Amino acid sequence: MSSSVAHADHHHEETFLSKYVFSMDHKMISKQFLITGIIMGLIGMAMSIAFRLQLAYPDTSFPILEWFFGSKWAPDGKLDAGYYMALVTMHGTIMVFYVLTAGLSGTFANLLLPLQIGARDMASPFMNMLSYWFFLLSSIVLLSSLFVETGPASGGWTIYPPLSALPKAMPGSGMGMTLWLTAIVLFIVSSLLGGINYISTVLNMRTKGMSMTRLPLTVWALFLTAVLGLLSFPVLLGGGLLLLFDRGFGTSFYLSDIYLGSAGALEHTGGSPILFQHLFWFLGHPEVYIIIMPALGITSEIIAVNSRKPIFGYTAMVISLMGIAFLSFIVWGHHMFITGMNPLLGAVFLVTTLIIAVPSAVKTFNYLATLWRGNIRFTNAMMFAIGLVSFFISGGLTGIFLGNATLDIQLHDTYFVVGHFHIVMGCAAIFGMLAGIYHWFPKMFGRLMNKPLGYIHFWFTFISAYLVFFPMHFMGLAGVPRRYYAFTLLPEYGVWFDVNVVMTLAAILGGIAQIVFLYNFFSSIFIGKKSGTNPWQANTLEWTTPEERIHGNWPGEIPTVYRWAYDYSNPAYDEDFMMQNVPDEGVEEELFETSKTKVNKSAKKPKPEAVTLFTLIKNWLKPNTI
Amino acid sequence: MTTQAPEQTGRVNPKKFSLWLLLLGILMLFSGLTSAYIVRKGDGNWFDFEIPSIFLYSTIIVLLSSITMIWAYRAAKKDDIKGIKLGLSATIILGTAFIISQYMGWLVLSDQGLHFVNPKYGDKVSASFLIAIAAIHLVHILAGIIYLAVMLINSFRYKIHKKNTLQISMCNTYWHFVGFLWVYLYMFLYFAPDF
């Protein structure tokens, strides 16, 4: 296409502002999303360590807490009970929306969609830029609520009324809640602008030969994620608007004549707080898949590349993603089993929920089958991808427990739920995101991340994540409720004190491991080893772009696609990978007569090296090579 | 703006496609709200009332405005600048009339004792629902009128003609969508007491 040439002609000088700040280049926007996501992630993690300290040592004074949060929120080095709730709420909000929705989808959809489908940029680069700026604004508004006098929102990230609908319900329900709602409205705008763009880009801007069945699974996952966001976020917006009417104008959509200790009975009558739960979880459940699906897509890609094998069951992977996407809209009731729901309706939600196990199991099976007898390269990204598979299994199994309406009556609002969703959604998605960062870091910055530091990061994070979240299941089975400030007043939970201490120490260990990651990430931008164009010998189109990462992605024509994304270890070729833009064998034969001999030579497959602990350690100790 | 046109491979214009996706999102917003209506009604303690007839006039006005919009769009395709201006102006006037008519509808409701805020009458949340749904819809109509005004200004600058119909065709799509969205909402609210 000639536009690329024309593009080079009127390439204007870029200033610092237009290149790094008000950039419309999808690669720069992806970095902006990533860095903002990392900062938000650190804040969310710091909060979790603060309240874990409280849970493990409810009676101990930590001067550092007072120094950090001030004497109002942590008098005498002990977290204030109300502020504990605020921290839990903000931790949930930040992690769910700001890190794992915007940080994950925003980063990788922006980076990978145009590069992997062969487009010069998004359908609307301007909307893309707006999407980031709304996200940043939303983050700032949310964080600013930490500094208001009455404290940030404290009613849980699910903002159930009446705590969210009644400004006088508790301190955090006032200004903090207003800022929370403002931030989320901005966030929804950002997410819709981004999502519309992603869908439009994938459907309309694929390069020649890139049929939907040749798309890498990352693109499929990010595409379906965007569809989920587009269909579910507006419903939350509707629910949020009714909430704003209740807060601001005094309507009674969600509020009824409940009795408040301080203010007596409310003036509202007839509102239904359960209605809000329906509207919230109609978004809330797809949101869980908005979080996990990009991570699954990233994992599919990384596992195939590093096993040097085609992904097992490509079509099944796509269909299972679609199945998960579809089912996610008809399972929201499983968050509400104990709201006095009609048992028949509960049974329906139970069945739809358990059906999700089918596509999820298909995906897990396919990951394992791809790994099976693969020529596995244990890169940092691969470790995190395998970590995701581990979390997806162990967290998914507990999902089957919780999906049972009868069991859920016992387990609801206990630590079992906390353990379940942190493993299957929190850890799995974070590991997917980290895997993506390690894998596509060379594409973003042209350098490799330090490998030994990556292994340290992986093992400490992996072990600490299981140490923190696995015991929670046992606590939940014993009936320990979530969201309690201190268990000192409840002697029946005394047996869990030591466990709480172990979990907190593990959380701190996990936090320290992230410092290793941060050092590795930021130092590698400047001093990492140069990566070359295709460091992982992958097939997808992003590795055909030049190292300079130019505006418009490809200096000449956009490559044409001749094959699917997973032509690894095909015995017909010399190399164990065949990039998507390399013409078919038939076409090749016309150009080079020698291709026949190639076939015979490479038909003999080398015997894969047996993976032993020794070879694993040997590989990890190697410097940055692959 | 961007330094290069996005390369297409012979599919629908990405901008137009993005608009369709936006409309899909808006549709989900209103399906959420009308579902909330049904769920809340199912809980009981609900005051059923007939939707005032003035909302029928709104519906007729918004349908008429769709016809004038078609007129403007056809004029654009025929390079009839005067027709574009007249059609767009008529659509803006009808859109404004729709807003006034909706507002009068709320006044009629108010006369019947059905306010947006009905403290102590929990069953009259039905009226809050009607007004909230209509108001959120009205915001979309307002956005449509702004869009139409931009188109009108562009037509005075001769930016809309036979060879540049993308903008007006997107505006056309949006306006029909919000119009028919109201028709759906009206029918929903009309038949809702019988659910």
Where are the regions that the model predicts?
Chain B
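...captures the hydrophobic TM-helix bundle architecture rather than a specific catalytic motif
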Residues: 1-195
